[in-house]
């Protein structure tokens, strides 16, 4: 198995001479709410049945996100494009953006939770990825499989990364693989984030966070503790915490 992985890596690394080093990725992020609810053991049976009845067996919500990247860093945020599901929704989008500076090894993030805005500033941490012996095509790129566990949200996350785009970036709060993350599968399909288009793009100001951001500044440890406490509160109430925080 190890020899197979080595051969695959050698083949993919040979493509780096012509690798894309700069551009924009368009992702489709699909949340399957009924399946997501089934991953939450603390929801009462009545609550699960009620939500399944209301939403149907295949209730899903699509949204689009963008990742700007180059060798220096990346920036992940909402897209202005609306999905079919959100056509009738005219409310404002929450502030959301994740900037990673690979040269300075820093993370800057803005997000909203329970009506409040938070700004996360910290160093980039090493993520505990396990690279597996599987490959598949995503948006025309041969990708390798990796896995990681989110111990706070109780998630098994599968990532597919393209070694022919040797940028250690990705969607959501995930990065740190030897290639751009093209797809995420969270908890066996409760949420799928999939790259649908990659465009060459000269990066200028696209990776800058909005100016004059206002919010409470916290570090990564405080962020994780806040998410952990919020989930614990919702567990006690037998409610789904992911109506308010990203799954």
Where are these regions (language model features)?
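Extended soluble regions of mature proteins
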Residues: 20-247
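Bacterial Sec-dependent N-terminal signal peptides
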Residues: 1-25, 244-247
């Amino acid at each position: 198995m190890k020899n197979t992985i080595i051969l695959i890596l050698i083949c993919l690394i040979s493509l780096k001479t012509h690798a894309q080093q700069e551009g924009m990725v368009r992702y489709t992020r699909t949340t399957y709410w009924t399946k997501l609810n089934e991953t939450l053991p603390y929801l009462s049976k009545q609550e699960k049945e009620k939500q399944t009845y209301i939403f149907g067996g295949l209730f899903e919500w699509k949204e689009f996100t963008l990742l700007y990247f180059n060798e220096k860093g990346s920036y992940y945020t909402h897209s202005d494009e609306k999905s079919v599901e959100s056509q009738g929704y005219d409310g404002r989008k929450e502030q959301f953006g994740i900037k990673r500076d690979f040269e300075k090894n820093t993370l800057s993030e803005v997000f909203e939770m329970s009506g409040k805005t938070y700004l996360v500033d910290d160093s980039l941490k090493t993520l505990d990825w396990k690279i597996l012996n599987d490959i598949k095509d995503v948006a025309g790129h041969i990708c390798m499989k990796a896995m990681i566990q989110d111990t706070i949200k109780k998630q098994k996350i599968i990532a597919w990364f393209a070694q022919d785009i040797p940028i250690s970036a990705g969607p959501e709060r995930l990065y740190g693989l030897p290639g751009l993350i093209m797809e995420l599968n969270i908890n066996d399909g409760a949420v799928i984030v999939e790259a649908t288009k990659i465009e060459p793009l000269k990066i200028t100001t696209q990776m800058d966070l909005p100016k004059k951001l206002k919010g409470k500044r916290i570090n990564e440890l405080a962020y994780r503790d806040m998410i952990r406490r919020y989930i614990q509160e919702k567990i006690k109430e037998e409610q789904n915490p992911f109506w308010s925080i990203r799954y």
